[in-house]
């Protein structure tokens, strides 16, 4: 019979995962990174699966820059096709 006494149950694992995300979210907030818990969770999963953290950071910065530009264009009267 397998010894399951050392394996955390799903509820414990989920609680630990939430704690990790909460800590990363707090760090993100302190650094003004503006990353929500869902985004942080995705980033952590990508890094755990071998994505280069520096490359991921570059992509996140570029996406944020693009989103800011779209918001600026919308505020100025809308986004035009091809721009």
Swiss-Prot record:
Gene Ontology biological-process entries: gamma-tubulin complex localization; microtubule nucleation by interphase microtubule organizing center; mitotic spindle assembly
Chief localisation class: cytoplasm
Location in the cell: Cytoplasm, Cytoskeleton, Microtubule organizing center, Spindle pole body
Residues annotated as signal peptide: none
A Pfam family: MOZART1
Disulfide bonds: none
Cellular compartments per GO CC: cytoplasm; gamma-tubulin ring complex; interphase microtubule organizing center; mitotic spindle pole body; spindle
UniProt family annotation: Belongs to the MOZART1 family.
PANTHER family to which the protein is assigned, alphabetical: MITOTIC-SPINDLE ORGANIZING PROTEIN 1
Subunit structure: Part of the gamma-tubulin complex.
Function comment: Required for gamma-tubulin complex recruitment to the microtubule organizing center (MTOC).
The protein's name in its UniProt record: Mitotic-spindle organizing protein 1
Species, as recorded: Botryotinia fuckeliana (strain B05.10)
